[in-house]
């Protein structure tokens, strides 16, 4: 894997609050190597470690994107949801930003059936086929469509398991992470000071509560994916 320069600036990370961890009482001792100090009851993340692992993650996604690989971005908490959908759309990635349905990856055959149902209902909705049904039947199907749109809308074009999964907030998305580990899917995870850094393939120590921090990390990863995709198109 070729190492590239991703312009990861420490001052920019500080302005985004990437270095602010959780309160010192809420910490995982395994995060000690990634913490540089304590300040006013909170842990301060060592940004040189953040820059190193973020750069490694950018190299990985660039390399994967340049070979036409598929990505899934997962971030379901309120602060991350909009950022995740925007980032994924920009980089042409799949995403889950509302709720992780248990077995979404490990029980892929069931997810595929749900996706087929969703696509069928979407076609009916577009062609106004639902309006030709009796009102009660149409109402039931519209509710089904709305439910599927909420939870599967971000993966509607996914035809198989993703090659790499990017996780925003390891604690919140633990089920998704465990499914990836079970299936051997490589993971990149944003981890705060209350997380276990040994679970994901690449763990990026960073504030997972501040919108500016999440945006900073996602922007770098998305830029690397887009650059990789451009390289793939040029070499095709």
UniProtKB/Swiss-Prot annotation:
Keyword tags: Chloroplast, Plastid, Ribonucleoprotein, Ribosomal protein
MF terms (GO), sorted A to Z: structural constituent of ribosome
Compartments, as annotated in UniProt: Plastid, Chloroplast
GO biological process: translation
Top-level taxon of origin: Eukaryota
Pfam families: Ribosomal_S2
GO cellular component, one term: mitochondrial small ribosomal subunit
PANTHER family assigned to the protein according to its UniProt record, in alphabetical order: 30S RIBOSOMAL PROTEIN S2 PROKARYOTIC AND ORGANELLAR, SMALL RIBOSOMAL SUBUNIT PROTEIN US2M
Family per similarity comment: Belongs to the universal ribosomal protein uS2 family.
Protein name: Small ribosomal subunit protein uS2c
UniProt source species: Aethionema grandiflorum
């Amino acid at each position: 894997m070729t190492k590239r320069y991703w312009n990861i600036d420490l001052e920019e990370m500080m302005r985004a609050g990437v270095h602010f961890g959780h309160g010192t009482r809420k910490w995982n001792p395994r995060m000690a190597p990634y913490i540089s100090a304590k300040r006013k009851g909170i842990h301060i993340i060592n940004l040189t470690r953040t820059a190193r692992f973020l750069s490694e993650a950018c190299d990985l996604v660039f390399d994967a994107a340049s070979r036409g690989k598929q990505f899934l971005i997962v971030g379901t908490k309120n602060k991350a949801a909009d950022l995740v959908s925007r980032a994924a759309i920009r980089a042409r990635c799949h995403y889950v930003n509302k709720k992780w349905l248990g077995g979404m990856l490990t029980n892929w055959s069931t997810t595929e059936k749900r996706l087929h149902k969703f696509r069928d209902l979407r076609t009916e909705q577009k062609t106004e086929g639902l309006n030709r049904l009796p009102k009660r039947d149409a109402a039931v199907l519209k509710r089904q469509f709305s439910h599927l749109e909420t939870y599967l809308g971000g993966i509607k074009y996914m035809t198989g398991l993703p090659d790499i999964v990017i996780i925003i907030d390891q604690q919140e998305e633990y089920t998704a992470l465990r499914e990836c580990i079970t299936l051997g899917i490589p993971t990149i995870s944003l981890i705060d000071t209350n997380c276990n850094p040994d679970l994901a393939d690449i763990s990026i120590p960073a504030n997972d509560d501040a919108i500016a921090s999440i945006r900073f990390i996602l922007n770098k990863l998305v830029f690397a994916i887009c650059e990789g995709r451009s390289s793939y198109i040029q070499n095709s």
